[in-house]
Amino acid sequence: MSSAPAIHAVPEPSSGTVISFDGTTIHYDLYDAPSPSMVLVIPGFWRDRKHPSMVNLAHLLHADGYRTAIMDPRGHGESEGTFGFNANEHYDVDAVARRLLETSTISSITLIGFSYGGAIAISTAARHELPIASLLLISPVADFAMITPKINPLTIHRHIAMSNALHRPRIAWGVRKLQKIRAVDDIVKVRVPKCFIHVKNDWLIHHGHSVALYEAASEPKELHVLDIEGNYHSDRIFHVASDAIEPLMRDFLARYTPR
C-alpha cells in the first residue's frame, strides 16, 4: 500500500467499545477528521483493526480527508465472542455504526468490507436502518458454500504469513450452514451504490463471488476484476498492486462519500 504524504499528520486513534445484541463487547478505533461522513472498515477473516494492513488503510483514508473507523469483528482482536461467518456479525457492525452516529457529527457512513467483512457489510446494509452512503467491497464472499481455495504449496507463503498462527481468531464451529447468511441473497435489498473489486482467480475467494454479487445487485453498481499476477486476496492487493486498487477506491469514495 502506498504511504500517506509526509506532510499529513495522522492522529493516534481513539478506541471505543460497544455491546452487541447478545452482550458481546466489540472494539473499534476511530481516526477522527472533520468530514461529514464516516468510512467504517470491516476487516476480513483472520484480520483485526491493529493489523498493519488495516492501520495503513486507515492512514491512507485519513490522509484523503475521511473520518475513518476500523472494528474488530467478533472473535478477532480484542472483541469478544466467536466468529460465525456472517451469522450475527451484522449486529456488531450496526452497534458500532450507531455509536459513531451518536457521538459525532456525521450524517452518513460508507462501509468498506474485506473478504468475509464484505459479506458482513452487505448484510448490515440489508438488515439495518442506517444512513449508508455506499458499499466498497474488496474480495467479498457471496456464499460460504462457494468457497473453494486453490492452494499452491509453492506460492502459499506469498499469501499467508507465519505470524498469522500467533493471532488465531476464535471461531463458532457449531454454527450450522443454514445459520450463515448468504450475502448474495441480501445484496438484492441494498439500494445504495456498490463497488466490487476482486483479483481474477483469487486463490481463496474466487472472483466468481464478486460476479455473482454484481449480477444480483441493483444499480448503481460497478465491478472491477483485476487481471494481475499472483491471485492475491483481500487487503493483500493493496500491498502488491496499490497502483491498481487505490485509484479505484479513491474514485468511488470521491463520488459517494462526502468529506
Listing of model-derived features with the role each one plays in the protein:
Residues W203-H209:
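Conserved alpha/beta-hydrolase "acid-adjacent" motif
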Residues E229-D243:
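Catalytic histidine-centered segment of alpha/beta-hydrolase-like enzymes
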Residues W46-H59:
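The serine-hydrolase catalytic nucleophile loop
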Residues S2-D32:
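N-terminal cap/lid segment of alpha/beta-hydrolase-fold proteins
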Residues R74-S104:
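Catalytic nucleophile-loop/oxyanion-hole region of alpha/beta-hydrolase
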Residues A126-R176:
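Hydrolase active-site cap/lid region
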Residues V190, F196-H198, D202:
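Short beta-strand/loop motif that positions the catalytic acidic residue
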